[in-house]
Each structure stands twice: as structure tokens, then as C-alpha cells.
Amino acid sequence: MFYKLIKKKCDEWMKSPDCTIRELIQYIYTQNKMRDAQIEAIKIYLFLKIACGNRPLWQLFTEGSFNSLDLTAMELTVEAREILTTNKAAAALLEYSLLTDKNGKQLAPELEKVIKSQSEHINYEDVFKKIFYGVNYTDYLFSLPMGAGKTYLMAAFIYLDLYFAQNEPSNPAFAHNFMVLAPSGLKSSIIPSLKNIQEFDPTWIIPEPTASNLRRIIKFEILDEQKSAKKSNLVRNPNAQKINNHQPLEDLMGLVAITNAEKVILDRVDKDEDTKIFDKEELVKIRIANELRDIIGKIPHLAVFIDEVHHAADGEIKLRQVVEEWTKKHSFCGVLGFSGTPYLEKVENVNLTDSFLIKNTDLSNVVYYYPLIKGIGNFLKVPEVK
């Protein structure tokens, strides 16, 4: 439920003199084309990009970016008060423990007790790194139910990034190019819904003539070729060739490539591993997969969108290994995940102290959550019982 703290701070920012997007948001409301769930997600997205610098969640919470707790009226020991007033990460975790569910029940009363009584034994920065999966790149998850317009929200994020990137081309918070990955377990899913990104009308979120100018610079590539190319000596993977056609890559802006995660996953070996154990056919498959991964890693200012993150399991782990490599090779803007069900298959434990575990049942990197129940009667039909 960390997203509740993010939303609270976002709402404050939207009303503050520091907010630079009020006119843009008002324009989106006036156009009346985007759903409320999508507009709220856009507010969070731009808040994290502009006010928070697109930094990783562990860093934002450690720095106290979402803190609003008044410690002065709270009953604390002298030692706990000293730590909580000087350590922003400690105050952030305490504020999280005080959150309540929809029935008003406190989220984590035992966590509150441990923080107040054993603060001196807790490495808060380390705890936040573990809570957010130990990744050093930006990794935000937007949770919207099916039918909320997730694909058009992806398109909106793409156009908004390009809008701000054109105004501030050297600002690392905004992506210039985008890789959209369909779930690895659903081999037929690329594609028809994600192809709808191409149909999005940017005038719904950005005024003319800017919207049309942005539309002109966008170049869509659907990486769904199954066989290797025969005509090119340099690139044998036809999907890699599609990206290679946009050389010089260092000047590239506006590429939106859509593919299945299966095509980039580290399914067999890395280049450094012993290849003698594979037959020729297997080696060809490995080299073709490596080719696509390598050229994606060279795309500058890249943002990766992962659809249906909850399909996780082994495929998700392998995909994360690939993304890790991309973050090292070139300028990289981060990962955006999208899921209708942001729940873990099993409880994940994070050690707070030697005797206390934080138990997570939800994906912790959710930055925006729109529950299914809110969609029913809004944009989803109420089921009719006969």
C-alpha cells in the first residue's frame, strides 16, 4: 500500500505553486476522452517524473519524499524520537505502518511497535531496498483492472514523455524511445490489444499543433517475425533488423517497438557460457535471441513497458535479468509495469530485525492502484443477475 503515501503527496503537489502540469491536466479533463482512472494515473506518473525526478522507489522512500507524519504529538521514547526525526527512511516506514485498509483497520500495528521500540537496530535504507526488490533502476507499477483502458494509458505515457523530452532533451527523466513487452506466457497476446497503441489520438492529452508534431515523429515497429532473415549478413534476426533500420541509433527519438517478452528472454545461455553443450540449431536460436537483446540495449533513453506483470514466475525473473543488462549498456529511463492483479503468488518476507519480518502479499512497487470495484458501474458494466 505504499501507493497511498505517493497519492497523498501527489495530491498536495497538484495544489502547490510547484506544480507545472495543472493546465495540461485541465486540458485533458476538457477533452473528456480519458477515463478518471487514466487521468489519476497520469497525475501520479507526471508527479513521479517531474517532482520526484523519476528516481527508484527505494531511494524516494529513503529520502522521505512522501513523508507527512507529524511526530511532535506522537508518544515516543527519547531514542525513538531522535531516530525518527533525523532518519527520513525510519519516518517513512513508520508512516506506512500507520496506514489503514478500506475498513479503517491499521495495516501493520506490529510493525509500528517494532519501529518505536527497536529503531536503533534497523537499517532502514537496506530494508527499503529489499522491499523494492533490490533494483537500482526506476521500476513503477500501475494497477488498473481489465477494461480501464490500460493500453491507451501506455500510449498516453509515451506521448507525454516525448512531449517533455522535446522541451528538455537532456532531462534523463523522460524517455525518447519505448519497448513494450507483452506477457511471455501468452504467446498470442501481443498483439491485438497492444497494437491499439497505434490508434491513440494524442489530441486527447496534448493540444495542437504539438500533438500532430509528436505523432509524426513516432515510428512503430511490431517485432513479431518468427524466422531468421536471409538477406542481411550483419543481422540475422529479422526483429533486430527492424530496429537496425533506424540507425544511427544514438540520434533516435520516437521509436515504439512492441514485442513478446519471449523474444528477448534469457532462455538458454549468456554469451560467456560454454556453447559446446549445444547443437548447431540451438546455437543459432541463442545467437538470434542475443542479437535482438543487444540491439535493444543500444537504444538511447529507453523506457520498457511490461504488460501483465503478475504473470511473473520464471519468465519474469529471466526478463528482469535482461532488463538489468539494458540498464548498464546505455542511457535508460526505467521500467513501467501494468497489471490488473498486483498480488504475489506467495508471501514475500523482508527482515526488519532478527526477530521480525515484514510480510508482503502485494507487489510493493505499485504506484497507482484503481480497484476493480470502483470500475464497476463506472466504465465496467454491472452484472445482471437473472
Language model: regions and residue ranges:
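RecA-like P-loop NTPase motor core of helicase/translocase proteins
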Residues: 1-386
